[in-house]
Amino acid sequence: MVSSITRIQNYVIDGAATSNGLETVLESNFAPSLISLPATPLFGTDGIRGKVGELLSAPLALQIGFWAGVVLRNHADQLGPVILGQDSRNSSDMLAMALSAGLTAAGLEVWYLGLCPTPCVAYLTSMSEAIGGVMISASHNPPEDNGIKIFGANGGKLSQALQAEIEKGLRGNLPITSNVSNCGRHYSRWELVKNYGEALKRPWQNKVNLQGMKVVLDLAWGAAVGLAPSVFAEMGAEVISLHNAADGDRINVNCGSTHLEMLQAAVQEHNADLGFAFDGDADRVLAVDPTGRPVNGDYILYLWGLYLKQQNQLPDNLIVSTVMANLGFEKAWQQQGGKLIRTAVGDQYVQAEMIKTGAMLGGEQSGHILCSHYGMTGDGLLTALHLASLVKQSGVSLAELIDQSFQTYPQLLRNVRVVDRDRRLSWQNCTPVQQAIALAEKAMGDTGRILVRASGTEPVIRVMVEAANAELANYWTNELVAQVQQHLAP
């Protein structure tokens, strides 16, 4: 007899069976969960993300776990576990357990890591017999949000094609099925997080240490607590930690990579060499130099790229970034004999372009940095260790390295809250907004750039204007924001 899992796989992949026909042959232990899905695609630029109790719920996580399990299993060369981790949000326990129930209902073994950074899940997935990984986190979003990120067996973000297969299953209105003979098991494997910590230090063993450096770390009450300070201390640095406890009520609140003010003050107060701010799941990081000046992903990519180029380790002197990368960065990198390729915003697009072109280094202005030598997922801790090591090896301060790099073009970024998801994702159909963009682009010509886009992770439309001077950038930003507010966010 063909198992119910096999028949569901056939439905998801081939569309060969109808919903009603399939339901008649399933030995179901679970009634179909009542879930409400938006009309627009569920997966955004960084997995599935939304407010808990609105978009995200335990029933939905159960369904996602089941259908993700079916799809991962169908595409696996051989059966293996799924690695599951989470950040510190109050809702993460609930979603992780529900998702694990779905995965085990799909017949898969779950290795549960508990609290850990997203790149820890990606690394352990790629270095084990796992067929996939899942992280429960909403990254830099506020505490009331949460999300589900799914990784393939290689530790990279799941492809859009496989995401579409999962969503097809979710929208098929089929019951979750399982029986005693095909249930998977859930195992706590907290000890594996230590393996990730050791891997972070490995590139510099017997080469570079951070002795004599004072580093301030803002852990954002999130997934990097404990781990990041211990790794930096073991590398020899004197560490001062901010927000270094797992706190689901305060994760990312006025701290971390989206709020650098406390880190800037602490770096100057303690006369530190540099500071790092992580987001809630530690897949991104921003830095602060000794003067308190912010150092974003553009600068990190430039400095890391220049180091690799000088070592003849950067294929074709190529860096992949996004449409958000500053023109100043691009022009400076070109002057170094390098080439910059831009993608849509989202590290999954950067990852795809890196694979396509064979690029070693890529990332985003927001602090997602990918180096294919270490994997294909942004890793805030690895990036921070690399930048600290570059500073130590250079013999000069991070402030001096930044002064020697490039001048940015004035760039303004404003977020306009648009609660209606369908209106937000279809904003390009709004004629007045499109006309305003065309007018601004014509006025600035090749001396500036405009980017308007719906966020894939937050209920906002982002308006970015880059211009030859701050006055122009401010003027056109205000004009475009007014149009978006008037026509899309009444």
Curated annotation (Swiss-Prot):
Catalytic residues (UniProt): S139
Kind of enzyme, top EC level? isomerase
What are the BP-aspect GO terms? carbohydrate metabolic process; peptidoglycan biosynthetic process; UDP-N-acetylglucosamine biosynthetic process
Report the SS bond pairs: none
Q: Which keywords does this chain's UniProt record carry?
A: Isomerase, Magnesium, Metal-binding, Phosphoprotein
This entry's Enzyme Commission designation comes to 5.4.2.10
- How are cofactors bound according to the entry's free-text note? Binds 1 Mg(2+) ion per subunit.
One Pfam entry name? PGM_PMM_IV
**InterPro entries given for it?**
A-D-PHexomutase_a/b/a-I, A-D-PHexomutase_a/b/a-I/II/III, A-D-PHexomutase_a/b/a-II, A-D-PHexomutase_a/b/a-III, A-D-PHexomutase_C, A-D-PHexomutase_C_sf, A-D-PHexomutase_CS, Alpha-D-phosphohexomutase_SF
Listed SUPFAM superfamilies: Phosphoglucomutase, C-terminal domain, Phosphoglucomutase, first 3 domains
Its cellular-component GO annotations read: cytosol
Q: Reaction(s) catalyzed by this protein?
A: alpha-D-glucosamine 1-phosphate = D-glucosamine 6-phosphate
Per the record, residues carrying Phosphoserine are S139
Q: Modified after translation how?
A: Activated by phosphorylation.
Q: Which cofactor does it need?
A: Mg(2+)
- What does the entry list as the binding residues for Mg(2+)? S139, D279, D281, D283
GO MF terms listed in the record are:
magnesium ion binding; phosphoglucosamine mutase activity; phosphomannomutase activity
Checking PANTHER family in the record gives:
PHOSPHOGLUCOMUTASE (ALPHA-D-GLUCOSE-1,6-BISPHOSPHATE-DEPENDENT), PHOSPHOHEXOSE MUTASE
Q: Which family does it belong to?
A: Belongs to the phosphohexose mutase family.
Annotated protein name in UniProt: Phosphoglucosamine mutase
Q: Which organism is it from?
A: Nostoc sp. (strain PCC 7120 / SAG 25.82 / UTEX 2576)
Gene transcribed to yield this protein: glmM
